[in-house]
Each structure stands twice: as structure tokens, then as C-alpha cells.
Amino acid sequence: MSYTLDSLGNPSSAYRRVTETRSSFSRVSGSPSSGFRSQSWSRGSPSTVSSSYKRSALAPRLTYSSAMLSSAESSLDFSQSSSLLDGGSGPGGDYKLSRSNEKEQIQGLNDRFAGYIEKVHYLEQQNKEIEAEIQALRQKQASHAQLGDAYDQEIRELRATLELVNHEKAQVQLDSDHLEEDIHRLKERFEEEARLRDDTEAAIRALRKDIEEASLVKVELDKKVQSLQDEVAFLRSNHEEEVADLLAQIQASHITVERKDYLKTDISSALKEIRSQLECHSDQNMAQAEEWFKCRYAKLTEAAQENKEAIRSAKEEIAEYRRQLQSKSIELESVRGTKESLERQLSDIEERHNHDLSSYQDTIQQLENELRGTKWEMARHLREYQDLLNVKMALDIEIAAYRKLLEGEETRFASTFAGSIGPLYTHRQPSITISSKFVEEIIEETKVEDEKSEM
């Protein structure tokens, strides 16, 4: 379908009117050629995004098919063809004046429709840019979900490591308790050995006292034996002297008897008798003294032997106790060293565990803060998207109003000249395809994705 020269007029004047209409539309609607395109949808800071959003608040998400433009052009052709038919059939100057007025109105509507088409083209371009931005946001949300899964995996690994460290700590604590029990048992044995040592030392002191007493008794007995031996020697020497004196006297008396022959025979026999009696008495005293001394010496020797046996056994017991005490002391020192080593290991493990736990908590807190910031950013984008949808709905209402106005003009012209002209063509309603997605659905999908990431 084409325009006639009568309806379109001069091409230069038509182009001038379209240009003026576009410039006036740019001044009225925010200059789509300059105002809209001068602002860019940036991914900067929240202040930059909000400012750019305020400047480009008229850029909603719209998807229109090319059928709408073809339908609009067909409706324009229909209006102009109706005006041509109207101008050719009506007689009179009033009708020409009304036709010129209607022609001017149609030209104004045509100019407005041209500006509207340009605005639609611009909105389609902005719609593509916004769709690309939404796709980028969805990819970012998917990357955040994957990052959340990675964080969850790392948190699970950290929790498993923490459980392993707690298990090792419990095992070390159990070993420490066992060592404490062993140390307590060794302390009890050490105290018992110390008591036995004290008892043994007390017995040794008592035996030493007995030994000292026995030594004193032995010294006294030795002194008595020595005195008795001296006395025996003195008595023996005295007896020998007396015997010698008596023998000398006997010899002297024997000589005298020899001289006197038979006068002194009785004296020699008496002396012999006296000598025999003295020797018998001396032998008896010597035998009794030796027997008493031997008995006493045997008793003292037996007592000393018994004391020596007791002392030797006591010394052996003391040496055995000393060896046991030394071995227990060495064992106690080794156990103390093991305890100190385990305590140091336990303190190191606790310190490392506390450090790892604090680092894990810091990491978890950092991840939670990042997740919270991501959710806030997503909520901010959803709010911006809601505002864009609101602007889009307002523009849809305005577009519907323009369409109703154009359809009303077409209907009025069609009803005016339906009887005279007849139907020239079948009018098709413009097809408009609007792809939109409600914010509630996006919020619901975001909640589902958050629940999946939390699980």
C-alpha cells in the first residue's frame, strides 16, 4: 500500500513535518535520540547504578514484533486513503474546510506516530540491552550459586577436619588420663617403697645399736679374758716361783737330809706330797679357767656370728631396696618426661586447634558476609527491575492509549465513508508481542535457588 501525492503533499514538506515532530517529541518525551542514548546502563557502584537508573527510568524491558510496525503503517495508509476518498467525494467549501482540518489532524497524528515509532525502536534497543544485563545477572547469580556450593563443600571439609581434631584431642586426653593413673599408681608404689625403706633403715639402726652393744660386750669380755689371762699368767709365774722356791728349799733340805741321812726322810715325803697337792690344785684352777674362758668365747663368737649374719642380710636387703628405688626413680623420671611431652603435645594441638577454629570461623563469617552482600545486590537489582517493569507498564498503557486513539480515528473514518466507498480492504489489528516476566516469579526463583544453596 502506498501514499498518493495528494495525501502526502510535498516530500520535502512531509520530511520537514516529520523532523519537526521528532524534535518536538524529543523535547516532550525526554529526547529519545539524545536523552535516552546518552545514558548507559553501567555495572558500577550502587550510587552509579541508581543515578543511571534514575536517568534511564523510561527504558523498560519490551519485546515487540515487526508486525506491530507493519500494522501501524497499514493503519496510517488506511487513514490517508480514507482522507483521499473523503476529499474526492464530498462537494462544497465547508466539507473541504473540514477535510483540511481532518487532514491537519491526521498529519499531526502521523507526526506523533512517527515519533512513537522512533521511540519504539529506541525502546527495543534498550530492551535488548536490559535483556543482556538480566542475562549477565542470571549468570552471575548462577556463579554465586556455584560459589555457594563450593563454600558449602569447603565448610563441610572444615567441619570434618574439626571433628577429626576433636577426636584426636579426646584420644590425647584419654592417654593423658591413663598416664595420670599410671603416675598415681607409681606414686603409691614409691610411697610404699619409701615406707619400706624407712622401716628397713629403722631396723638397720636397731641392728647397728645391737652391734654396738655386742661390740661393747665383746670389748668388755676381751678385757676380762685379757685380765684373766694376765691373772693366770701371774698365778702361773707366781706358782712357778713358789715351786722353784719350794724346789730350792727341797733341794736344800735334800742336801741337808743327805747329810743327816735318816733324820729328814719325813720332810722330803711331806714336800713331795705338798708339791703334788699344789700341782693338782693349780691344774684344776687352770682347767676351770680355760673351760670358762672357752665357753664365754664360744658364746661371744656365736653372738657375733649371728649379728654378722643379720648385718649381712640387712645390708643385702638395703642394697636390693636401693636398686629397686633407683629403678623406680628412673621409671618415674621417664614417666614424668613422657607426661611433660604429652602435655606439650596437647597444648600444641589445642593451640593449633584454636587457631584453625578461629581461621575457619573467620572464613565462614567472610563467606556469610559475601553471601549477604550478594543477596542485597540481588534484591537491589530486583527492586530496579520492579521499577523498570512499572515504567514498562506505564509505557504499555500509553501505547494502548495511542493505539485506541488511532483505532478510533480509523473507525470514525471507516464509519463515515462506509456507505459511499465500501470496504476497500480488511483491517488487521496490530499484533504486539510482549515478553515479560513478573517480579514475583523472579523472587520465587531466587528464593528456591537460595534454599538449594543453603541445603
Curated annotation (Swiss-Prot):
Residues 151-249 are annotated as: Coil 1B. Residues 138-150 are annotated as: Linker 1. The modification Phosphotyrosine is found at residue 321. Residues 106-137 are annotated as: Coil 1A. Residues 414-455 are annotated as: Tail. Residues 22-45 have a biased composition (Low complexity). Residues 267-288 are annotated as: Coil 2A. There are a number of repeats of the tripeptide K-S-P, NFM is phosphorylated on a number of the serines in this motif. It is thought that phosphorylation of NFM results in the formation of interfilament cross bridges that are important in the maintenance of axonal caliber. Phosphorylation seems to play a major role in the functioning of the larger neurofilament polypeptides (NF-M and NF-H), the levels of phosphorylation being altered developmentally and coincidentally with a change in the neurofilament function. The modification Phosphoserine is found at residues 31, 100, 227, 347, 420, 431, 453. InterPro entries: IF_conserved, IF_rod_dom, Intermed_filament_DNA-bd, Intermediate_filament, Keratin_I. Forms heterodimers with NEFL; which can further hetero-oligomerize (in vitro). Forms heterodimers with INA (in vitro). This is Neurofilament medium polypeptide. It comes from Sus scrofa (Pig).
